[in-house]
């Protein structure tokens, strides 16, 4: 696990952007952000990185939190492991990756038809099981 100092040094080139002094993050900023994103795969790593970034944000009071959250987008980091970080947020919450919601069984296997659906009505009108007529009785 990287130390806070190493993480913050990797992100130092981002300072002019997150302070609003530059319109785009530099290549050095994006390089550091991509490296940090690649090293925050587990919950504890994300919590540690969040706490380090928060400490840096408190040290440099002129950092714009909105610009911090834009770094991944500007640097082409898709599906960043770290959520936008705010100085006041509880970093322990970034250690939990939300589970993807499960679809109801009915949606996993196609649409469910209801009484007003013509397909449903057609199924009701034709019998599902065909029973042959009884054989004529012999007299």
Curated annotation (Swiss-Prot):
**GO MF term set:** lipid binding
Question: Which terms does the UniProt entry file under GO BP?
Answer: lipid transport
Where in this protein does the record put region Disordered? 102-139
Q: Which SMART domains match?
A: AAI
Tell me which positions the record assigns to the signal sequence. Answer: none
Family annotation (InterPro entries): Bifun_inhib/LTP/seed_sf, Bifunc_inhib/LTP/seed_store, Plant_nsLTP
Pfam families, sorted: Tryp_alpha_amyl
- Biased composition (Pro residues) is annotated at 130-139
Keywords for this protein: Allergen, Disulfide bond, Lipid-binding, Transport
Locations of Basic and acidic residues compositional bias? Answer: 118-128
S-S bonds = 14-29, 30-75, 50-91
Does the record carry Disulfide bond as a key word? yes
Query: Of which family is this protein a member?
Result: Belongs to the plant LTP family.
Report the protein's function: Plant non-specific lipid-transfer proteins transfer phospholipids as well as galactolipids across membranes. May play a role in wax or cutin deposition in the cell walls of expanding epidermal cells and certain secretory tissues.
**Record's protein name:** Probable non-specific lipid-transfer protein
| Species whose genome carries this gene | Parietaria judaica
